[in-house]
Amino acid sequence: MSTSESPNTPGQGRRARARARELALLALYQWQMTGQDLGAIEAQHLEIDPEEPPVEAGDDEHYPRYPHDGLDRPYFRALLHGVPARLNDLDQALEPLLDRPLRTLDPLEKALLRLGAWELSERMDTPWRVIINEAVNLAKRFGAEQSHRYINGVLDKLARGLPLRATEIEADRKRRGR
């Protein structure tokens, strides 16, 4: 289990991690599609031209740019390098939960499922519901019209099957009276 050096301002850490997830999703998608070196992809996604004013996420839907402030860079790096390092394990965990072969999934959905699976299995410092909610939000933003439902269902099943998450999920269930 790894940790992150997130900003300490209330709410800032969550936003910084959300930005890290979004940037990691785009970088992992690029890696899946091109096979480009992860180090080169990381440098490309973190590079900002100081002469160019930052573009807010969403202004350029194909390649949003991020200012250095407000991005949990260690978390971005952990996601970007953690997913490929455990790719076979993640794919084996996901495959039985899918309604079709992993290789036939939309590349963005595949990247998002792998990202969520890695976080669920490696980042016990982040609640399971937060991880799934963030993945659903990214699917709504970047995925096909109904992909958020698919992402939600698969990651929910995965979380419930992970022994490391069992105590957290059971406590959550009791809190909600289910």
Curated annotation (Swiss-Prot):
GO terms for biological process: DNA-templated transcription termination; transcription antitermination. InterPro entries: NusB-like_sf (IPR035926), NusB_fam (IPR011605), NusB_RsmB_TIM44 (IPR006027). GO terms for molecular function: RNA binding. SUPFAM superfamilies: NusB-like. It holds the Pfam family NusB. GO terms for cellular component: cytosol. The keyword Iron-sulfur does not apply. Keywords: RNA-binding, Transcription, Transcription antitermination, Transcription regulation. PANTHER family: ANTITERMINATION NUSB DOMAIN-CONTAINING PROTEIN, N UTILIZATION SUBSTANCE PROTEIN B-RELATED. Involved in transcription antitermination. Required for transcription of ribosomal RNA (rRNA) genes. Binds specifically to the boxA antiterminator sequence of the ribosomal RNA (rrn) operons. Belongs to the NusB family. This is Transcription antitermination protein NusB. It comes from Alkalilimnicola ehrlichii (strain ATCC BAA-1101 / DSM 17681 / MLHE-1).
